[in-house]
């Protein structure tokens, strides 16, 4: 049947079907040949839609909520359609060609893992790919998009590079492809599968079955996540590892450069906020680093470049710590996502800049390459630097710093280095990165799982399992580690005070307790819907009326209740009639506010906003703000909270929660981990597969799902839910965290 479907698609002019059938005809022990280039937009994407920087399909599924906008699903579908492309690969260091003229080496068949039953699964995968119109290299995890860092669409690139994340990421075992193939044979509706995988997500009706099956395959093809080692938990364990390990990989993000004075990018007064005033057509922060937008208007990027150009900043304590590890021969490699070149300033030799840097610039047309000093004058004078060798009337003869833009490739040496380093590393340390951008985000799951892993970051990463979590300002944590390591490391310390450990959460400050005691005690009960818990907030009519008047006069969008409150609330979408029915106000004076119907509706909506925001303001606070100057908090079994940690506490039940919870984490991790023990992930995909196994055990369902024959799938897919990351939170190259 798969052959018939593929032939039908081929007859209809589908090049993907022909590619899939060609893949199915290859010997099973040979790597799949790269597909020929196909021009035009991917499935699920209109011709006018940009193709650069699309998040993975599963991330798109997560971003689409129960009332999922069709645009988000179309973006997820576009990612699914592009998922079979080669993972990023760009010019080798020294070529400086911004993505063309790449070197290609043939890949040997033994580059791939030889799992038992591999040949049978490759044949099944090819048949499934043919049946749904999928192309030939979907089998490998390198097909998953990396938030825009995918292979260029030029023919030259297709001919010249094979380096990709498939060289070093674990390969999924048998399962998802046979599963999809057999469900295709029995005519299963892919929407029923997606409903089980993502129960709160509703795909728009206009998406066809082939696109939906592609999304299913992407979700099920995630590599297995590492599980925490139970024998490594404390900061003492971390210090011992730093003393004993000789081949340490340090993965750094924007957090290591915060203390250097580099301007913030996304804050209210950050770089993007200021650029948006000068360039109102800049749609979002991502566009500044989109290669297509750069070709149309490079001015926003060069205005940004002036603010972080090399030579203006000095390395942080984190940089110096890594440099000393390198000097002592303990550093295997520092993989940095930053573009500020502070690693070189600090003297780190074994450095790999995953997303390029400002160190060099090259022409978009002729690839002429220069040092950063050659274009410094133009950038600081806010003149777009031009290539001296190209004709003056060539509009694209621009000297672009060799930073990896969305829509460009990652350096080929990144993939080659990871292919070697993954088998050599004896300790992984992640500093100042939330690991949201691939393929760098795949590193913790791609090295041997027995290798210890330490996180040093402002917030926890619920989608990954680190052995020791040191949460807070990176320099504060590194300073404490240097004290404990002693010797040359102690000389790096910028703060001579060694911190003391506490194991009980400090009480709320007395000043704040007095403030809370003065709040009106009378409760106001709001039942948002039949399934939501009842909330209790102060009812005093004078307080509420004052806040309502303030919000009405200043516009509800300008009402500042707290920095973190009501982030996900959408009061403009709340039905006024429902608010009136569900708000039980005892004071008649509040009911009489407003004279006209429009005024009542507006004030009712604002009151709803105030009531929703008020509990959040009072309930959540950063635990680190309760710490004294020389303290850090130990939260068993493996979490430490230092100053600057973005870990919050509910005042009522003293439950810790992360600012990232619910936005960039798995569904099982968005509950607040308690003070006693952080919660573990509980995958919804695990429940999905458990249900399928139960079905296959029944006589009437035996063989019906087509999944029971895939033995070994559940172990892999149980850990595959890390696909549900935030679609819209795409970071720029120096903040790929």
Swiss-Prot record:
Residues involved in Zn(2+) binding: 363, 366, 387, 390
Disulfide connectivity for this sequence is none
Q: Subcellular location, in the record's words? A: Nucleus, PML body; Cytoplasm; Nucleus
Q: How is it modified after translation?
A: Methylated on multiple lysine residues; methylation is enhanced after DNA damage and is dispensable for deacetylase activity toward p53/TP53. Phosphorylated. Phosphorylated by STK4/MST1, resulting in inhibition of SIRT1-mediated p53/TP53 deacetylation. Phosphorylation by MAPK8/JNK1 at Ser-46 and Thr-522 leads to increased nuclear localization and enzymatic activity. Phosphorylation at Thr-522 by DYRK1A and DYRK3 activates deacetylase activity and promotes cell survival. Phosphorylation by mammalian target of rapamycin complex 1 (mTORC1) at Ser-46 inhibits deacetylation activity. Phosphorylated by CaMK2, leading to increased p53/TP53 and NF-kappa-B p65/RELA deacetylation activity.
Required cofactor names = Zn(2+)
Q: In the record, which positions carry Phosphothreonine?
A: 522, 536
Cofactor stoichiometry and binding? Binds 1 zinc ion per subunit.
Q: Which gene encodes it?
A: Sirt1
Instruction: Indicate, by first and last residue, each region the UniProt record lists as having compositional bias (Low complexity).
Output: 1-28, 46-56, 75-94, 656-676
**Where does this protein come from, organism-wise?**
Mus musculus (Mouse)
Q: What induces it?
A: By calorie restriction which induces endothelial nitric oxide synthase (eNOS) expression. Induced in liver by pyruvate during fasting. Expressed in a circadian manner in the liver with maximal and minimal levels reached at around Zeitgeber time (ZT) 16 and ZT4, respectively. Its deacetylase activity in the liver is also regulated in a circadian manner, with a peak at ZT15. Down-regulated by palmitate; palmitate down-regulation is mediated by the induction of miR-195 that directly targets SIRT1.
- Which UniProt key words apply to this protein? Acetylation, Apoptosis, Biological rhythms, Cytoplasm, Developmental protein, Differentiation, Metal-binding, Mitochondrion, Myogenesis, NAD, Nucleus, Phosphoprotein, S-nitrosylation, Transcription, Transcription regulation, Transferase, Ubl conjugation, Zinc
* Role: NAD-dependent protein deacetylase that links transcriptional regulation directly to intracellular energetics and participates in the coordination of several separated cellular functions such as cell cycle, response to DNA damage, metabolism, apoptosis and autophagy. Can modulate chromatin function through deacetylation of histones and can promote alterations in the methylation of histones and DNA, leading to transcriptional repression. Deacetylates a broad range of transcription factors and coregulators, thereby regulating target gene expression positively and negatively.
According to the record, mutating residue 600 to R results in:
Does not affect protein deacetylase activity
- Return the protein name: NAD-dependent protein deacetylase sirtuin-1
